[in-house]
Amino acid sequence: MAKFKIKKGDDVKIITGDDKGKIGKVLSVLPKKSQVIVEGCKIAKKAIKPSEKNPKGGFINKEMPMDISNVALVEG
C-alpha cells in the first residue's frame, strides 16, 4: 500500500474533471482504493429509503470518492 502525502483536513485543488479548479477540504482518505473524498466536490444525488427518521424517503446530495491522482495539495 502506497503512502500518501494528502491527509484528512488538508486543502486540495481539483486538477481534472467537472470540478477542475475548485479548492476543498479532504473529508476522508481511502488508501486501499487510492481515493479521497473532498468537501463540495463530485456531488451525486443519492436516493434514501423511507425509515422511521424519514418516513417519506427522498434524495440527498453526497460527496463521492475521486482518485487521489485527480487532486493536488494546496500549500499554506
Swiss-Prot record:
Keywords: Ribonucleoprotein, Ribosomal protein, RNA-binding, rRNA-binding. The keyword NADP does not apply. GO terms for molecular function: rRNA binding; structural constituent of ribosome. The keyword rRNA-binding applies. One of its GO terms (cellular component) is ribonucleoprotein complex. Part of the 50S ribosomal subunit. Belongs to the universal ribosomal protein uL24 family. One of two assembly initiator proteins, it binds directly to the 5'-end of the 23S rRNA, where it nucleates assembly of the 50S subunit. This is Large ribosomal subunit protein uL24. It comes from Campylobacter hominis (strain ATCC BAA-381 / DSM 21671 / CCUG 45161 / LMG 19568 / NCTC 13146 / CH001A). The lineage of its organism: Bacteria, Pseudomonadati, Campylobacterota, Epsilonproteobacteria, Campylobacterales.
